[in-house]
Structures are given as C-alpha cells and as structure tokens.
Amino acid sequence: MPITYHYEIDTKVIRAKATDLVSTKEILDYVTNIIEDTKIEKGFIEVVDFQTVSDLAVTYSELDPFPYIWEKYMKKGCKAVVIYAPTNLSFGTFRMLQTAVMIRHEVAENLFVVVRSKEELEVKLKELIA
C-alpha cells in the first residue's frame, strides 16, 4: 500500500508515509482506513509525509470528494492535518486540496496545513501538541 500509518496513542498523532506512485483511490482508501480505525481517539493530529512519492496520479475532478471527507474527519475528532509536501508537484496538489476544503468548510488555515520542509513540520507539530 503506498500510504501506511501508525498511531501514537500518547500524543494522539497519526504518522503516515506515502511512497511510490499515489493515486486518488489510494488516498481515499487511506482516509477511509483512518476514519474507520477504532484505536484513533478524538483530538488526533494527522501528519502525512509525501517526501518519497515518485508521482501523484490525481486530477482536479477526482478531488471533489475530499471536502466531504473533511466532514467525517471533523466528526471523528480531528484536531489538525499537516501535509509534508517538499516537491513542487506534491506541494501544489495539496495546496489545491487545502483550498477546496477551506472554501467548502470555512476551515482555518492552521487546521489543514501544507508545509515544504521538515523544520516547518516539526514546528507546526510541536505547536499543535502543546
């Protein structure tokens, strides 16, 4: 599976890693797994690392379900999502997704964050856990 994750119970942080070619279906499958995972507690923070992704097979029209999925994340008790997207392709794609979610749900930018560096990621994560 191109996106795997583990849940840190003590910090309520989901650390996910995407690899290889990632499609919209694989992202949707991953998100469904998070929503259905009964071990994940309310107040979780999701961190997804796209550093080792070789390509994203995603189109704008395929992103249409994502704002609705955000509703399910909120119902599950998501505190924030942080996407580490260091390449131009991944950063641009996830900024597009971030905008779609923010427009649909009037989500504050600090709840759905896309960062380009590990340093930004660690700063944001410390801020959210505190």
Regions found by a protein language model. Name each.
Residues 2-130:
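Amphipathic, Lys/Arg-enriched alpha-helical "gate/interface" segment within cytosolic domains
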